[in-house]
Amino acid sequence: METWQELKVTVKREGEELVSNLLIELGAQGVAIEDSLDYVGNVDRFGEIFPEVEQQEEIVVTAYYPDTVDVTVVEVDLQARISELTDFMDLGEVKMGTTALAEEDWADNWKKYYEPARITHDLTIVPSWTDYEATAGEKIIKLDPGMAFGTGTHPTTKMSLFALEQVLRGGETVLDVGTGSGVLSIASSLLGAKEIFAYDLDDVAVRVAQENIELNPGMENIHVAAGDLLKGVEIEADVIVANILADILIHLTEDAYRLVKDEGYLIMSGIIKDKWDMVRQSAESAGFFLETHMIQGEWNACVFKKTKDISGVIGG
């Protein structure tokens, strides 16, 4: 019987997606997240701030490797990669531990962490293997969390989904920059966008996004391609959404302003508290006006608008 190895990495919550992605890059066949916080308060109107909730600082990212992989080498490589990123994000004291599993344990273990999750008023994320009956008006996003890039329930993703739900009215062109799992593209299609163009620099992300899109019927209007932010893109959009690190977002804003139509929106998430002012200044310098600022814990998300009428924007 083939055996598997379970590598558990304890890290600050801010590092969930980063560590998950690094583990996949280092050969993990699946990842699972243990998090004490899986909650966002209801938002009744656009622009309302999410409530603070009591939470533990650390989460556990569990990665699964076949026994042919030397996990001690993975641990060394992971620690080295994390050390290179300490200037961008405080991951706290990173702790690691390994356990051997039988094949049937692997098949069951990682799935137990994932259940259907109602993320916004309209959107529910459902693991691909789960039978789920939607209620009236509920829109279902099927994802395979074992493919990497998390489950779509991370605070940065949740706030991105809230923002999309509020700005999309139907018929828009959307650019999804750093698509990852493809969850924001799928949501955009469900919320009525006419065409969605999704880009990611990572070939793994491009493949994963395409596979997740194929789990959801009627997604022929989503086009996935490799791309470095918006370099070389000439498609004008009503909405651009990017859930990536703040230090990367600041290199996006000028191209975003060039491509967003008048009265269009730039949604940005993945911004830790200490980087918020930097991102805001970058967007405003490009010509955008801040319409909405959302906060959950250490995370910030925002909606900027390209407009000449500033009466409805913050400070207008």
From Swiss-Prot:
What name has this protein been given in UniProt? Ribosomal protein L11 methyltransferase
Biological process (GO) annotations? methylation
Name the job this protein performs: Methylates ribosomal protein L11.
Q: Which GO terms describe its cellular component?
A: cytoplasm
The similarity comment for this entry is: Belongs to the methyltransferase superfamily. PrmA family.
UniProt xrefs under SUPFAM superfamilies: S-adenosyl-L-methionine-dependent methyltransferases (SSF53335)
- UniProt cross-references to NCBIfam families, sorted A to Z: prmA
Task: List UniProt keywords, sorted A-Z.
Answer: Cytoplasm, Methyltransferase, S-adenosyl-L-methionine, Transferase
Subcellular location, in the record's words? Cytoplasm
EC no. given is: 2.1.1.-
Q: Which InterPro entries match?
A: Ribosomal_L11_MeTrfase_PrmA (IPR050078), Ribosomal_PrmA_MeTrfase (IPR004498), SAM-dependent_MTases_sf (IPR029063)
Top EC class for this record: transferase
Binding annotation for S-adenosyl-L-methionine:
157, 178, 200, 243
Q: What is its main location?
A: cytoplasm
Which reactions fall under this protein's catalytic activity? L-lysyl-[protein] + 3 S-adenosyl-L-methionine = N(6),N(6),N(6)-trimethyl-L-lysyl-[protein] + 3 S-adenosyl-L-homocysteine + 3 H(+)
The GO terms this record gives for MF are: protein-lysine N-methyltransferase activity
Q: Which domain of life is it from?
A: Bacteria
Instruction: Please give the organism.
Output: Streptococcus pneumoniae (strain 70585)
Gene responsible for this protein: prmA
